[in-house]
Amino acid sequence: IWSGIQGAF
C-alpha cells in the first residue's frame, strides 16, 4: 500500500 510518497506497506 503506497502512503503518499513514503510508500509504507
Curated annotation (Swiss-Prot):
At the top level, the lineage of the source is Eukaryota
Tissue expression, as annotated, is: Expressed by the venom gland.
GO cellular component annotations, sorted alphabetically? Answer: extracellular region
Q: Which UniProt keywords apply?
A: Secreted
Does Secreted show up as a keyword for this record?
A: yes
Coarsely, its chief localization is secreted
Q: Any idea where this protein resides?
A: Secreted
Keyword Secreted on this protein?
A: yes
Its protein name is: Venom peptide 1
